[in-house]
């Protein structure tokens, strides 16, 4: 997976198409990601007297990683990501549109 926690991504398909958000959690075994403010679902929660009250709560549900693209911080557009090795041997991600390094992988 080319997406990591705290990356800014944009949804490219589905009901939340066009929304941007920060990656809260990456689930590599399921090939899914949880994004802040995207794919909001309602869950019915029973009250636990010592911990929390019950009711209907809203939270983010995971979506497939293939439905999101990383937003390049340099050109501010959704882009595909490539991998490259620097001269010192460090593996980094780079933007396929502008060629700039996104961050170290």
From Swiss-Prot:
InterPro entries: KOW (IPR005824), Rib_uL2_dom2 (IPR014722), Ribosomal_uL24 (IPR003256), Ribosomal_uL24_CS (IPR005825), Ribosomal_uL24_KOW (IPR041988), Translation_prot_SH3-like_sf (IPR008991). Belongs to the universal ribosomal protein uL24 family. Part of the 50S ribosomal subunit. PROSITE patterns: RIBOSOMAL_L24 (PS01108). One of its GO terms (biological process) is translation. The lineage of its organism: Bacteria, Thermotogati, Thermotogota, Thermotogae, Thermotogales. The keyword Chloroplast does not apply. Gene3D superfamilies: 2.30.30.30. One of two assembly initiator proteins, it binds directly to the 5'-end of the 23S rRNA, where it nucleates assembly of the 50S subunit. This is Large ribosomal subunit protein uL24. GO terms for cellular component: ribonucleoprotein complex; ribosome. One of its GO terms (molecular function) is structural constituent of ribosome. Keywords: Ribonucleoprotein, Ribosomal protein, RNA-binding, rRNA-binding. It holds the Pfam family ribosomal_L24.
